[in-house]
Design a protein with these regions (language model features):
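Membrane-embedded helix-loop-helix hairpins and adjacent transmembrane boundary segments
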Residues: 1-260
């Protein structure tokens, strides 16, 4: 592997053995900021049977993450020789090609089913959480507090269909890889909801309007940063999104409490 591309074994080097630099390293580290803002992840915390299970859940989750990410690295490095010549978006097919090329059809089918299971599990969780938020928090909470039963059921179904169609439309962009889409969505959720969630837990002075301002500013920053050009805008949009969202929450909450 070192003879083929030394950059594959050096965490400070990118493609073509070029140094990542501050922007590259900071962008990689920034992925961790996104976890507190993922609705489908937060739903797991909310659904836990008892806070006493948190320590056990943490051990299970971290063990699973370490195994999965380590295996992903091994698959990628093995693919350099097993299926050479994959570049750009084609490199995302390395696991599929290795499974169908080197495994028995039955085992290959199990591996491919695993991919679909992971996709469907995450997609279903995100769509259901988004549908619930649109139905209960926005439609019923802001517009029709008296709605219930079949009305909410049909609104929820419409929300599920609309979100699925929107996701399908975004996925049709031929210029983007799966990783590009995931990174953008990860930054959007992390910047919009992450700072509000964390500060709600650890900063008692946060206000309702402060949290709302943080969500709006964080989401808008990610959208606008993606449209910028130049070296500075190579920085992962998660970083400015979280930064500006946090500032918005602190400033609005502070001014609001002073006014009171």
């Amino acid at each position: 592997i070192a003879e083929r591309d030394p950059g594959l074994l050096d965490p400070t080097l990118g493609a073509g053995s070029e140094a990542l630099g501050f922007i590259g390293i900071a962008s990689l580290v920034a992925w961790g900021f996104g976890y507190p803002g993922q609705p489908h992840v937060l739903a797991r915390f909310m659904a836990i049977k008892s806070p006493d299970y948190m320590a056990k859940a943490r051990r299970v989750a971290m063990s699973w993450v370490i195994i999965v990410l380590a295996a992903a690295i091994v698959v990628g490095l093995t693919g350099v020789f097993a299926v050479p010549g994959l570049v750009g978006a084609e490199s995302e097919k390395v696991f599929i090609l290795m499974s169908t090329t080197y495994l028995h059809p039955v085992l290959a089918g199990v591996c491919l089913s695993g991919i679909m299971a992971a996709i469907m599990s995450t997609a279903a969780a995100q769509i259901l959480v988004a549908s619930s938020a649109l139905t209960q928090d926005i439609y019923r909470g802001l517009f029709r507090s008296s709605s219930h039963g079949k009305e909410l059921l049909w609104v929820g179904r419409g929300a599920v269909l609309s979100i699925a169609v929107l996701a399908f439309w975004l996925a049709l962009d031929p210029e983007r890889t799966v990783l590009d889409l995931v990174a953008w969505a990860w930054a959007g959720f992390g910047s919009a909801f992450g700072p509000a969630i964390v500060l709600s837990l650890y900063w008692p002075r946060i206000t309702r309007n402060g949290a709302l301002a943080g969500m709006i500013v964080g989401g808008a920053t990610v959208m606008l940063w993606k449209q910028g050009s130049g070296e500075l805008f190579q920085l992962y949009e998660m970083i400015p999104g979280v930064l500006f969202s946090t500032l918005a929450i602190v400033l609005v909450s502070t001014f609001e409490r002073r006014a009171d």
